[in-house]
């Protein structure tokens, strides 16, 4: 598992919720 990919995934999820 790539931690960097995981961080990007979490960031995108968070950004999505913030934009909603």
Swiss-Prot record:
GO cellular component, as recorded: extracellular region
Keyword hit for Secreted: yes
Tissue: Expressed by the venom gland.
Keyword terms: Amidation, Secreted, Toxin
Residues with PTM Serine amide: 20
GO molecular function terms noted in the UniProt entry: toxin activity
Annotated compartments: Secreted
Main subcellular localisation: secreted
Keyword hit for Secreted: yes
Family: Belongs to the cationic peptide 04 (cupiennin) family. 09 subfamily.
Protein name (database record): Short cationic peptide-6a
Lineage, top ranks: Eukaryota, Metazoa, Ecdysozoa, Arthropoda, Chelicerata
């Amino acid at each position: 598992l790539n931690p960097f990919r995981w961080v990007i995934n979490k960031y995108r999820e968070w950004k999505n919720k913030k934009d909603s």
